[in-house]
Each structure stands twice: as structure tokens, then as C-alpha cells.
A protein has these predicted regions:
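Internal amphipathic alpha-helical repeat/solenoid segments
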Residues: 2-114, 133-145
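Active-site-proximal segments of catalytic enzyme domains
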Residues: 150-151
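Conserved small/polar residues in nucleotide/adenosyl-binding loops
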Residues: 166-171
């Protein structure tokens, strides 16, 4: 995990990002006993560290390789016709599917709050996959309908940013 962190900080490495996402997905699916996963974590501190590392470093690496611009009306513009986007499109989908699973299964309010705040930074990259966006909005609505006030506010903030992707610009 420390090697991946160093590689992500120094080089913004997509290879280290893919390994980190594979570990993230494996940890979240570890309760499935019939499926063999590439990574297995038994310590709760390592589990928390892996989740927080993935949530914090994924937006940083994506912003480096595929930066987005915010337009005057608040919408996001992502350069999707680049080679880097085609390489990182599947990891973005994997990230959101794992975050959805995390939001549905995580009982700790602090970790849910971190997951909501960090996943909001990745929402501009969600525009290509409407099914994942729909599932993400459902998970956000689930968090908004239950939980404490700061989680409700974070979920509403994520919903607002997600709605900016799919609403038409206002007429002038």
C-alpha cells in the first residue's frame, strides 16, 4: 500500500491506480467466500487505510491525466477524445461501482462522510456511463434519506454536482 501511495504521489501512475482499485474492489467483495480475490485484508486498520487511500488518490490521479474544466454555467467539460481517457475509463467505472457498494454496506458514519466527500470530486468523470450514474444517485438518495445531518448535507452536495452533469443549461 505504501509503494502504491509513493508511486501515485510521484508519478501519478495509472498502473498503481489499477492495482489500488483492484485491492479496493477485492476488499469490498471479500465476504463472498466462493470467489477468489487477488487481495485479502484481515486487519481493520489496513482496510480503513486502503479505503481512504483509494478515495483520496483517485481524484488526484484523474485530475492529472484527464483534467476537466468548469464552464461559466457550472457544468463540467472532460476531454474524452484522448488516449489517457480511454485507458482510465474502466478504472473510473470500477471506482464508482466500488463506491456504490461501499455506501450501501458501510456502517461507520465517519467513513461514509469521507466516501461522499471524496467521490464528489470524481463526479465530472461519471458522464459517460448513465447506468452507473443512476446507481450512484440511488446510493446517494439512500444516504440522504438516512443518517446524520452532515451525511445528509454531503449526499445532497453530491446529488447537486451529479445533477449538473445531466441537466440542460438554463435558457438565457
Amino acid at each position: 500500500l505504501q509503494q502504491w501511495q509513493k508511486s501515485l504521489l510521484r508519478h501519478r501512475s495509472p498502473r498503481a491506480l489499477r492495482r489500488l482499485l483492484l485491492a479496493f474492489r477485492s476488499v469490498l467483495s471479500s465476504h463472498d467466500d466462493e470467489v477468489q480475490h487477488a487481495f485479502h485484508v484481515q486487519d481493520s486498520r489496513v482496510f480503513s487505510k486502503l479505503i481512504i487511500t483509494t478515495l483520496k488518490y483517485m481524484p488526484m490521479v484523474m485530475e492529472y491525466h484527464v483534467p476537466y474544466k468548469k464552464t461559466a454555467d457550472g457544468r463540467f467539460k472532460v476531454q474524452t477524445h484522448t488516449q489517457k481517457w480511454h485507458v482510465l475509463q474502466r478504472p473510473v467505472r470500477s471506482y464508482f461501482m466500488s463506491v456504490i457498494k461501499l455506501l450501501q454496506t458501510l456502517p461507520e458514519a465517519d467513513m461514509v462522510y469521507v466516501a461522499l466527500n471524496e467521490s464528489a470530486k470524481m463526479v465530472p468523470y461519471l458522464h459517460q456511463d448513465r447506468r452507473v450514474a443512476r446507481d450512484y444517485v440511488r446510493a446517494l438518495l439512500g444516504q440522504w434519506s438516512s443518517g446524520e445531518d452532515r451525511i445528509r448535507l454531503a449526499a445532497f452536495s453530491c446529488l447537486y454536482v451529479t445533477c449538473l452533469l445531466y441537466t440542460s443549461p438554463s435558457p438565457r
